[in-house]
A protein has these predicted regions:
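Conserved interdomain hinge at the start of the Helicase C-terminal
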Residues: 10, 20-77
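Conserved catalytic network of the ASCE P-loop NTPase/AAA+ motor domain
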Residues: 5-7, 47-49, 77, 99-105, ...
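Conserved RecA-like helicase motor-core motifs
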Residues: 55, 69, 73-96
Length: 204
């Protein structure tokens, strides 16, 4: 990272601790996580509490992105702008979101990984939240690159990497293994990171 061209990046790894769960398949685990009420409320509260422009990245539009957008949008202050960007949003609208964000200093963009993993550069971005599990190293680094493009007023950016520990005594859950892979990437890239464990209650 060349000095002065890129923001300083801090990574907060937020490990949500669930009661032990056994999942037959990766898909079963994903369904459990993206429909988990407390998990989604945690992401909503984090998005609303952060200062500056915040990008919330999700994987599945209807099942997760739309749910997060609704929760955030219903609970925001009147003067705060919230955008929902996904593959179904045409390029012109995506460009409009980029322009607005570069003018704003406190907007929230709920966006699919696919839309923002490549192509859109937002200079004035302060926070990124990984709301959906993603094991793809390239995708993660592209998402991080989004934050690192330095805006004129910005010195520091923060990535909130949310992961989930549903491990049993005998087995780690799938997405926790993916998180461990991401940590390896952060070490290789020499990013600053801190791991914080947060206790979640069971599913309601």
């Amino acid at each position: 990272m060349r000095q002065g061209h890129l923001s300083q990046l801090d990574i907060q790894c937020l490990v949500l601790k669930h009661p032990p769960q056994k999942f037959e398949t990766y898909e079963d685990e994903i369904q459990y996580l993206i429909t988990h009420e407390q998990r989604n409320n945690f992401i909503k509260n984090l998005s609303l509490d952060l200062k500056g422009n915040t990008l919330v990245l999700f994987q599945r539009v209807e099942a997760h992105g739309a749910v997060l957008y609704d929760k955030i949008n219903k609970n925001k202050r009147d003067d705060r702008k919230v955008f929902f960007v996904h593959g179904g949003v045409d390029a012109e609208e995506r460009e409009q979101v980029r322009e607005i964000t570069e003018r704003e200093n406190n907007a929230i963009i709920v966006a699919s990984y696919g839309t923002f993993s490549t192509g859109i550069n937002i200079k004035n971005l302060h926070n990124v939240i990984f709301a959906s599990p993603s094991k793809s190293r390239i995708r993660n680094l592209q998402s991080i690159g989004r934050v690192l493009r330095k805006g004129k007023d910005k010195v520091k950016a923060t990535l909130y990497d949310i992961s989930d520990d549903c491990s049993t005594k005998s087995k780690r859950n799938y997405t926790l293994n993916h998180f461990i892979e991401r940590i390896k990437t952060y070490n290789e890239e020499k990013f600053n990171y801190e791991i914080i464990t947060i206790q979640l209650r069971g599913q309601l």
